[in-house]
């Protein structure tokens, strides 16, 4: 059985994300990976786990009302201690400083449409826009999003369509990584 997506986790997406970063940077270990937005959704949970296991410096920048469970954070701290990575949970705008990667996801997950207006108001300060990208202090910072994106909410069109955006490479890599999972798990090839 494969977990393609649940309310809590999205592991196959993380494989595509990390392949995209490996292709772009040539490494994962030591990258500063900042997730901005709803910090308790399936993408934030899975990215934090994956980044912790791969030795990345993971920063979750979200309003405290949308932080992940303390149990998951502690588990990820233990993974990071083993891999040489780190986990930081914050609500501060300067969290993006020095980021190699900025990642966001939709502000209103599937099944939460009734909370859309409240989420937009709460998360507006966490929008990935040109100003946020400039606050990284790096011209080489890349942008990722698992798609589909609501341009104008979690990310502005100018960032989404910019050279920093690797979202289409990331989307293509979903096909390759999911095929790899299938080949690796469907049984022995004769």
Each PLM stretch: what is its role?
Residues 140-141, 146-190:
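Adenosine-phosphate binding glycine-rich loop
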Residues 1-22, 151:
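Phosphate/diphosphate ligand-binding glycine-rich loop within oxidoreductases
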Residues 77-157:
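Rossmann-like adenosine-cofactor binding region
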Residues 23-104:
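Glycine-rich phosphate/diphosphate-binding loop of Rossmann-like nucleotide-binding domains
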Residues 5-9, 63-66, 171-174:
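Short, acidic/turn-prone active-site loops that include or flank metal/cofactor-
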Residues 1-4, 10, 35, 144, ...:
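General beta-strand structural signal in soluble alpha/beta enzymes
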Residues 10-15, 69-71, 176-180:
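Short, charged, surface-exposed secondary-structure boundary motifs
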């Amino acid at each position: 059985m494969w977990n393609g997506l649940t309310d809590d986790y999205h592991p196959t997406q993380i494989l595509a994300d990390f392949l995209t970063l490996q292709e772009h940077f040539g490494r994962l270990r030591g990258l500063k990976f900042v997730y901005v937005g709803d910090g308790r959704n399936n993408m934030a949970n899975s990215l934090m786990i994956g980044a912790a296991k791969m030795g990345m410096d993971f920063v979750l920048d979200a309003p405290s009302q949308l932080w992940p469970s303390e149990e998951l954070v502690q588990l990820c701290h233990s993974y990071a201690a083993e891999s040489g990575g780190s986990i930081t949970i914050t609500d501060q705008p300067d969290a993006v400083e020095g980021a190699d990667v900025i990642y966001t996801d939709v502000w209103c997950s599937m099944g939460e449409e009734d909370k859309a207006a409240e989420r937009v108001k709460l998360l507006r300060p966490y929008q990935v826009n040109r100003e946020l990208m400039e606050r990284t202090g790096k011209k080489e910072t890349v942008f990722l999003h698992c798609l589909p994106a609501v341009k104008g909410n979690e990310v502005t069109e100018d960032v989404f369509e910019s050279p920093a955006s690797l979202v289409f490479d990331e989307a293509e890599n979903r096909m390759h990584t999911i095929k790899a999972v299938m080949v690796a798990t469907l049984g022995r090839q004769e």
